[in-house]
Curated annotation (Swiss-Prot):
Subcellular location: Secreted
Annotated keywords: Disulfide bond, Ion channel impairing toxin, Knottin, Neurotoxin, Secreted, Signal, Toxin
Segment forming the signal sequence: 1-19
Family named by the database record: Belongs to the neurotoxin 27 (Jztx-72) family. ICK-41 subfamily.
GO MF term set: ion channel regulator activity; toxin activity
Pfam families (alphabetical): Cys_Knot_tox
Comment block on domains: The presence of a 'disulfide through disulfide knot' structurally defines this protein as a knottin.
Sections of the chain in a coiled coil: none
UniProt function note: Probable neurotoxin with ion channel impairing activity.
Protein name: Toxin ICK-41
Primary site of residence: secreted
């Protein structure tokens, strides 16, 4: 019984330390302001349209938008590689 409890605790700590695997491009460099000077919505946060989302610094390699997240009911901002099939 003890090994099972230890294994569950290890898994729980691993999830807490490593965090959620879907970061929606938050680690990709992006601009924090819109061209009009207003703040933009960071990747992974809720939005209603693409114009609210932060744009990637490298616009040729990465694309951005506001779309439905898998297993979530709301729309969120995302940044992903243009050549990735996971976008």
């Amino acid at each position: 019984m003890k090994p099972i409890v230890y294994m569950l605790l290890f898994c729980a700590f691993t999830v807490v330390i490593l965090g959620h695997p879907n970061n929606h491009g938050a680690l990709i460099p992006h601009h924090d302001k819109l061209p009009n000077g207003e703040s933009c919505t960071r990747p992974g946060y809720s939005c209603s349209e693409s114009s609210q989302c932060c744009t990637p610094v490298d616009g040729e390699t990465f694309t951005y938008g506001c779309g439905r997240a898998w297993m979530e009911g709301s729309k969120i901002c995302y940044i992903c590689n243009r050549e990735s099939s996971m976008c």
